[in-house]
Curated annotation (Swiss-Prot):
Organism: Escherichia coli O55:H7 (strain CB9615 / EPEC)
Designated name of the protein: Ureidoacrylate amidohydrolase RutB
Any one of the GO BP annotations: uracil catabolic process
Enzyme Commission code: 3.5.1.110
PANTHER family (alphabetical): ISOCHORISMATASE-LIKE DOMAIN-CONTAINING PROTEIN, PEROXYUREIDOACRYLATE/UREIDOACRYLATE AMIDOHYDROLASE-RELATED
UniProt similarity note: Belongs to the isochorismatase family. RutB subfamily.
Pfam families associated with the record: Isochorismatase (PF00857)
């Protein structure tokens, strides 16, 4: 059943143009999705996995607020909201054993091997670490998807969910820009999706230059980069043009 929108009626779809780098991009919000990547305590809260693994999460609060703003605007415009949660079962079977590169490269798994007292606490489904931050709450009509790897397209129904709804444009927010956000956007690019990142609604894992490098990669090779204020302006009723 189509999602309602205050910006369109039965006369046809509505298009808007988002100012972005390297150039503006035009899309129909009702055939687009806002994707919120891994806004879990693990990635955005002191005491979560990233913090315990030695990454700086002290500047994530503005990102949370900006995501709230973007979600509100997207929902009002009739965009599908998709929330990802990264993690595994309590026994970490889904994480893969020594035969998986994920076993060797996941900083969560490596941190637990170094600190056995954390075993079962990091990114385990049902744990505080796995939960979305308190400020971000999915609403009826949103879709919440678990994912076992960095990319939201790997071993998830994301592609079929999007294709069944005719969605081709994806707007990304979340953490970490240089890991799960970029991985999902890149995989989407290879599957013919148009990906946009809202830079002030994302946060990197690592130094500030990592954020800049990820955004450079995205705007140069794989997608587009904009910001929350510009995104919200593009979704205001005065910004829409009707398509036949």
């Amino acid at each position: 059943m189509p999602r309602p929108s205050p910006c369109a009626d039965s006369g046809g779809g509505m298009m808007t143009t988002l100012t972005a780098r390297p150039e503006a991009i035009t899309f129909d919000p009702q055939q687009s999705a806002l994707i919120v990547v891994d806004m879990q305590n693990a990635y955005a809260t002191p005491g979560g996995y990233l913090d315990l693994a030695g990454f700086d999460v002290s500047t994530t609060r503005p990102v949370i607020a900006n995501i709230q703003t973007a979600v509100t605007a997207a929902r009002a415009a009739g965009m599908l909201i998709i929330w990802f949660q990264n993690g595994w079962d309590e026994q970490y079977v889904e994480a893969g054993g020594p035969g998986s590169p994920n076993f060797h490269k996941s900083n969560a798994l490596k941190t637990m091997r170094k600190q056995p007292q954390l075993q079962g606490k990091l990114l385990a489904k049902g744990s505080w670490d796995y939960q979305l931050v308190d400020e971000l709450v999915p609403q009826p009509g949103d879709i919440v998807l678990p994912k076992p790897r960095y990319s939201g397209f790997f071993n998830t129904p994301l592609d079929s969910i999007l294709r069944s709804r005719g969605i081709r444009h994806l707007v990304f927010t979340g953490i970490a820009t240089n890991v799960c956000v970029e991985s999902t956007l890149r995989d989407g690019f290879f599957l013919e999706y148009f990906g946009v990142v809202l830079e002030d609604a994302t946060h990197q894992a690592g130094p500030e230059f990592v954020q800049k490098a990820a955004l450079f990669n995205i705007e140069t090779f794989f997608g587009w980069v904009s910001d929350v204020e510009t995104f919200c302006d593009a979704l205001s009723p005065t910004s829409f043009a009707r398509i036949a």
